[in-house]
């Protein structure tokens, strides 16, 4: 009788893709896949280890499954992903309920690892480079959109970030493998493809000797049936004119740039091992908007980095007000063991860090309210994602919104749309970052 396996995948979309490949490997090896890990023989926790809150979420999930194991509802618990890669010894020592701990390099041999864990505690930590860059996936997203991971690892070495330690150096996939996967996804119903990596803008530098994201995107735009092509996790240093021109010219590429800037103070950015200052970043945002009219700019910021003064925080807050990003996320700095920033002097009190993040987000909500009002009275294209039974209306995303991190468009419709259908919605109202309207 086949062993039933179920997965809980935590963290970012990149980790989600890893989990999808892992589950496909298990299916091909004869395991029975279970949608609910609580109903499986083996529960896999695909963990995130990026910041403290993500680590805690991973630990909480393991402990919740441990309760089910104690009750006899599941037989084994195995842990994979970033937390497993980074804290292998601690997991074994502090969480005795866990039957297997596997690093990211073990994904290719996950079937053998789990079979071993059925008999005795097992751990496997091959070289990170052994993690396959591509492969068959058991998709966890709806059929109408999918992520494509175009590279693994990171070479940027930001002082606050543990990803290079966890994931290793930057490794790009070939254009041919990405195009093949993209065509398969579109043939199976995907209307939107979302390119992801730790740093998408450096795609190809290791394979082709030059930044090749623009060439890749032009190639993907030729796929019949693809409606939207979106790219996340761009890095400001590598945002080339060729890429901006490609985004402006290609109709299938949504006019949306996710550009995590982290800060605007030159001193803070230098301590983060990032380049730029308020003036240069302001100029870059202006350039993007000039080259791509109507673009949606999304960024991510960090408050409370060690040594951040009131003046430097004020500079960041003023920068946010001046630029008026269409989408923005802000997080209090989380100290990561083993990173240079963890050893820096002048740490900021948690209460101060969190308060500064709240100030930024409050300011951003005011900006989004004003920008949302400008949408009222107009028509937008919406990718239908579901029906809200409480509000008795449909909802979906516009080209201005990426899954999970951005807002929604809620709309009424006399003609029932199907999931994944692209419909035109007349915007009647904007509230708290979401739009409300009627199918045109």
Which ranges hold each PLM region?
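Proteins enriched for Cys/Gly/acidic motifs involved in redox and nucleic-acid/cofactor modification
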Residues: 1-203, 242, 253, 257, ...
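Conserved SAM/AdoMet-binding glycine-rich loop
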Residues: 77-81, 86, 187-311, 322
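Extended hydrophobic-aromatic, low-complexity segments
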Residues: 255-256, 269-270, 281, 293-296, ...
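Conserved, mostly hydrophobic/aromatic
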Residues: 178, 195, 231, 259, ...
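Conserved beta-strand core positions
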Residues: 5, 42-43, 146, 193, ...
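Terminal RNA-binding accessory module
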Residues: 343-440
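Active-site proximal loops enriched in glycine and acidic residues that flank catalytic Cys/His/Asp
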Residues: 197, 233, 261-263, 299-303, ...
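Radical SAM enzyme [4Fe-4S]-AdoMet core and its adjacent flexible, acidic
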Residues: 12, 204-225, 271-272, 335-366
């Amino acid at each position: 009788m086949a062993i039933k396996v179920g997965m809980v995948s935590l963290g970012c979309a990149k980790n989600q893709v890893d989990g999808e490949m892992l589950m496909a490997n298990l299916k091909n090896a004869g395991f029975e896949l279970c949608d609910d890990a609580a109903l499986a023989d083996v529960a896999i926790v695909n963990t995130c280890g990026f910041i403290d809150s993500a680590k805690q979420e991973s630990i909480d999930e393991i402990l919740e499954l441990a309760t089910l194991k104690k009750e006899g509802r599941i037989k084994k618990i195995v842990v994979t992903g970033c937390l497993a890669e980074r804290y292998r010894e601690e997991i074994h020592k502090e969480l005795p309920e866990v039957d297997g701990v596997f690093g990211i390099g073990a994904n290719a041999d996950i079937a053998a690892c789990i079979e071993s864990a059925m008999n005795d505690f097992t751990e496997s930590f091959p070289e990170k480079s052994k993690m396959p860059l591509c492969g068959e996936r058991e998709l966890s997203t709806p059929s109408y959109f999918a992520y494509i991971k175009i590279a693994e690892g990171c070479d940027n070495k930001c002082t606050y970030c543990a990803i290079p330690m966890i994931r290793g150096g930057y490794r790009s996939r070939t254009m041919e493998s990405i195009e093949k996967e993209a065509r398969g996804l579109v043939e199976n119903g995907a209307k939107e493809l979302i390119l992801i990596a730790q740093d998408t803008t450096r795609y190809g530098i290791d394979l082709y000797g030059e930044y090749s994201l623009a060439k890749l995107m032009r190639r993907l735009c030729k796929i019949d049936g693809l409606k939207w092509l979106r790219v996340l996790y761009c890095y400001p240093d590598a945002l080339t004119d060729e890429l901006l021109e490609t985004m402006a010219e290609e109709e299938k590429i949504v006019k949306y740039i996710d550009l995590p800037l982290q800060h605007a103070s030159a001193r803070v950015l230098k301590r983060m091992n990032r380049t730029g200052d308020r003036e240069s970043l302001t100029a870059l945002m202006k350039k993007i908007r000039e080259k791509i009219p109507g673009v949606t700019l999304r960024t991510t910021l960090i408050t409370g980095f060690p040594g951040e003064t009131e003046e430097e925080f004020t500079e960041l807050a003023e920068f946010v007000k001046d630029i008026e990003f269409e989408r923005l996320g802000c997080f209090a700095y989380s100290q990561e063991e083993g990173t240079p920033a963890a050893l820096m002097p002048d740490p900021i009190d948690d209460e101060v860090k969190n308060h500064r993040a709240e100030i930024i987000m409050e300011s951003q909500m005011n900006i989004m309210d004003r920008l949302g009002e400008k949408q009222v009275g107009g028509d937008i294209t919406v990718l239908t994602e579901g029906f809200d039974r409480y509000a008795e209306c449909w909802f979906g995303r516009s080209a201005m919104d990426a899954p999970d991190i951005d807002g929604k468009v809620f709309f009424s419709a006399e003609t029932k749309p199907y999931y994944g259908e692209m419909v035109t919605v007349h915007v009647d109202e904007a509230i708290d970052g979401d739009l409300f309207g009627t199918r045109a």
